Amino acid sequence: MKVLSVSSEVFPLIKTGGLADVSGALPIALKAFGVETKTLLPGYPAVMKVIRDAVIRLEFPDLLGERATVLEVQHEGLDLLILDAPAYYDRPGGPYLDPLGKDYPDNWRRFAALSLAASEIAAGLMPGWRPDLVHTHDWQAALTSVYMRYYPTPELPSVLTIHNIAFQGQFGSEIFAGLRLPAHAFTTESIEYYGTVGFLKGGLKTAHAITTVSPTYADEILTSEFGMGLEGVIASRVDDLHGIVNGIDTDIWNPATDPVVHTHYGQTTLKNREENRRSIAEFFGLDNDDAPIFCVISRLTWQKGMDIVANVADEIVAMGGKLVVLGSGEAALEGALLASASRHPGRVGVSIGYNEPMSHLMQAGCDAIIIPSRFEPCGLTQLYGLRYGCVPIVARTGGLNDTVIDANHAALAAKVATGIQFAPVTETGMLQAIRRAMHFYQDRKLWTQLQKQGMKSDVSWEKSAERYAALYSSLVSKGM
């Protein structure tokens, strides 16, 4: 089976979040199930800088007003189609924001162009290759199925994955003419959304199947609390909605071989984590004692519950724990966490910014990772924690709920517990979870059981890829 995947970011070429990890890992995992994937992404400067030996596959003299070329290249096991359109993508800043951190005003056109190019490839305009199915990711690619509906494109099946419904690609109605869609596309059954143009909404209405990145999140987005205004649209498509948990690259995230980890280890050699623990203490200026080290590796935002972490830092220290934080985000939260470190030298350490090697070492050396997200479609850091024996303490929401088995009495007795869940997502809820963790930590046999059971969890892409392959096959066989 041939699949065209369409994404605004793909690891390892360009990444701002978990979307890139999925777009980079899923195509490789799908190969084992007979799925050949070509992934279309924009030609940002960071992408164009690293690709080599690219071949021109398709040219657009006028892609929504600008020239563009589709280049094909192989890169680290991925078959990539790069949309080289300098007018859209060759600019300073990131994929979505300018150097001042503001949305590019023409983001609607930049990602409509990506979607239109994808629909043309789906129609067979690229010589020698035509997909059997199109898989799009988030609002930036969601217009693909809209273009496929209204342009003379073969009725190929399409799948839209929602990685985070908070990001919807909503624009004023004045941009509609620039999309070059027929006038009758501006309806509630397509992209019209309360008088505006909704990219994600249009994809939800026109894709043949919709997936989210965990079963619990699939249920949550049907509610007003988590649906972000689109719960009614999703409810109308509930029979086509599937929750499939993400995996991680277990070759990259492997404590037995990870080049960043100072001392390698596995389930039978957990004592080797001690050297990594000492490295963490040295980096963050912590006292080198036996107190449990709780870590946070996250964007420092309200959605991630970082205000709660800042507010309970004093209590964690008072209970006898230590806390280390790696991340960046809202200035007020950065300041509050840095203030905690100043109040508690040797017990709290904070590093502002993102440091990929340190994120690996923290998973390999800290005792538990705290993930108090108010909503979390899937989450990856808890999967890394499971893999590395860094016990996850998570909010009971989204993919966190689906991937971490709470250490309640029944789960402990059955020896299946892998972490600690808490609800509600409040200071009280988090502190109760940390008290439970402190209690378990005092019983080294019980704590080791939690670590080992987590490390046994299958967090690879294999199961997820199998489910995607089955979904693809069912859609193709129906001739949609």
UniProtKB/Swiss-Prot annotation:
Class of enzymatic activity (EC top level): transferase
Keyword entries, A-Z: Glycogen biosynthesis, Glycosyltransferase, Transferase
Function: Synthesizes alpha-1,4-glucan chains using ADP-glucose.
Single biological process term from Gene Ontology: glycogen biosynthetic process
Keyword Transferase: yes
Catalytic activity: [(1->4)-alpha-D-glucosyl](n) + ADP-alpha-D-glucose = [(1->4)-alpha-D-glucosyl](n+1) + ADP + H(+)
Family note: Belongs to the glycosyltransferase 1 family. Bacterial/plant glycogen synthase subfamily.
Designated name of the protein: Glycogen synthase
Gene Ontology cellular component list: cytosol
Positions bound to ADP-alpha-D-glucose: 15
Gene3D superfamilies: Glycogen Phosphorylase B
PANTHER family xrefs: ALPHA AMYLASE DOMAIN-CONTAINING PROTEIN, GRANULE-BOUND STARCH SYNTHASE 1, CHLOROPLASTIC/AMYLOPLASTIC
InterPro entries in alphabetical order: Glyco_trans_1 (IPR001296), GS/SS (IPR011835), Starch_synth_cat_dom (IPR013534)
Organism: Rhizobium johnstonii (strain DSM 114642 / LMG 32736 / 3841) (Rhizobium leguminosarum bv. viciae)
One of the record's GO molecular function terms: alpha-1,4-glucan glucosyltransferase (UDP-glucose donor) activity
Pathway: Glycan biosynthesis; glycogen biosynthesis
Database matches in HAMAP family: Glycogen_synth
Entry EC number(s): 2.4.1.21
Phylogenetic lineage: Bacteria, Pseudomonadati, Pseudomonadota, Alphaproteobacteria, Hyphomicrobiales
